[in-house]
């Protein structure tokens, strides 16, 4: 049995639960603070982590309070005048050594929580927020520790560049990462297949406000923060293509699955995103192929709402075999993957879409379509740039 004086010492030096504060001079609306408090409390009290396989499973809140208290204060179990505790101490030491990898996983779980918390509030066109987790001494308690979560903010400022003899508003592109801050995007022109003496010098990336609006209109079924985060990730690891007019296209991926392309130019020493093309738009390889197969042109796609992701989050479209065959044949299988992976978490779906109406609109009839379209396999190839 642990002596009372040691239990008292543990209590005074315990690790406290998570506390959320606004950092420094950051400006954070109360609704965001309250949302962070409620959401983080719920997540940390419900997400589990395995400490000892088959024996000990705790919540993240318990891990960062009870388990951390024991780990940090292990030395207080080692007084010379308590030899009876030696077997217990040996077990604790082994337990503490085994905690290293578990701490890494617990910290990664918290980082992911802090990232997702900002998805509902981050907007590259307005303000970016990030949360930082620190273990700080508790005031007034000897070696007491508090799990402090500070909310930081950065208000976005726009500038302008001259495009086609007109001044266009642009925003420097970056994203706020938990425990870090703003990570700005820069790309070497050589990555865009540009060949000159300066091609290996990274250039800052900017996005026209027009392009940001197109992204929101066309990827219209997820929180803005998650849409912008995936833009950031796509540009940090750019996959570059050229269209038939030699325009540079950078693939946009939503959590790893293609959903469209950014058309970019190099202007005034900056890489500038001019617009965003949804994967079915006519300016994309898939959009051109879809038009060739179905005869659908830009206004047809707009009429049928095929120019936005929310349409493809409806079960009427995602589960229609004929539509799936057409999408597969046009290399638009990525939309089926997005449906399968993300439909349940979509915040907006097209409630009025009628897949049969679309098939009638394009005159779909298996008797008149090539065999390859009638029984198209699920393709996994990169788009062919034409």
Name every feature range the model reports, one short phrase each.
Residues 1-386:
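Ribonuclease/tRNase effector modules and their secretory precursors
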